């Protein structure tokens, strides 16, 4: 059955809606006070409604109720799929919509406000930590829809999975807090909630034309009405937006866009007005510090293992911890900045399933070794069983620039100090063995039919036999030894961080990683070897160390092939890894074959 199309003017709708909500006779002055519409406009609208049979004896009639039906809200969609990265570290433990603010769980308060307005058809779109929301179906009768693309797409993916449900629909975010109920059973037209911001702002600033229609939106501005909170789609908007979304959804450039960006790009075709709310009614929290400012008791009532770890480690109260912001979010780690007093720190939270990827006990053994040697001054403490770690934050630091000889020299000497420490680690790490492990993963997706793959593999295995025969020593090694894992402080001092892959390895392993991942030229690589040895390396040493460039390249090449088989796109790194394996292997094999096998070993000198 096709929904009816509304024929009321805005003033007529306002008058009838006021009478519907009151469910009692109202004078024109009472309607004026309820709708904030001028008395003259109210008078004209009342007379028109009386003439149409919508009002009798200052009450809404059955015909008036029927005239409001096209404006009845069908349903609501609450988007709760996102990672909420800016809300670190709390979002590491639970989704933002499940936080308790002023004594109420954010999404539960919003559902109850929708129910109070008579809206019971509610869909919650979930993704990250979706299991935290499942109970809402039993408790509140909501429908749960899973957005599996929440990692790879912005919130347009959440509207995509419910696009057929869009009609007269409220579209909400699970983490908003409304101090008064903004929801209504009947709404005249599509709108975006807005609050006024004085002075400069980085919020989305709205420009309007006649009737309050939104004509443009800019990111950032000053003294402006800004997008803030919930949105209402009427049927016309939903139909138009769904058509546009279906046209652009598969385009690669659409994936990272907010749905609002898609709307703005087609703003001429989609009618939506601005609805103004007084300051303080709509509350969006972009950081932990913001919600703490809104609810002073938030931290005291927060059940968080992360904050317990911080408080116990640093001997502070939970309310002493401030200035949170995310640093990075990846496959193995989630990291955020925080401060206690004037001191700054980093909290590392283990990613989901990383206990199957990373040997945390080996990592922490290496972290303690690096701290003892002064190679990593940032590490404070952590828990190898649970995977969390607290480190010092180095302000104004940057990553290593391997093109600067002085910095490359400092890095290679640091590696040499690690190797000469006389210490040992329980774990062993070998690039070729790791590559073979990745190869087994790759085979799980079908036969390896990459041209000349097995030819290259055979050469790598032969080179490994020759390099092993050199009998260079095993030593504690970082094994992820490249510029992004170095921090350079303002004085130029280095710290080597992220020891997840550390173990006992051939002393050439770290050199191999540096050449591959920093994409050093042959001349730069040879210079790095001179820095490492403190002299010009012998031909035997050079041959052996450059072999580990091949091994590192091949290992990560096979890893990249496996990731591509899984559906990930590693980009140009697949080629970079491949080239470092294939470009050197023939030359090195020839060097080994022509070298005298009885060439004496030359011990490196410091």
Regions found by a protein language model. Name each.
Residues 14, 179-254:
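Conserved core of the sugar-phosphate nucleotidyltransferase
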Residues 212, 508-537, 550-568, 587:
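Active-site activation/catalytic loop segments of kinase-like enzymes and analogous catalytic loops
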Residues 131-205:
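Conserved beta-loop-beta/alpha segment of the NTase-like Rossmann-fold superfamily
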Residues 325-432, 439, 446-455, 471:
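ATP-binding pocket architecture of kinase catalytic cores
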Residues 325-347, 462-511:
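Active-site acidic catalytic loop and adjacent metal/ATP-binding pocket
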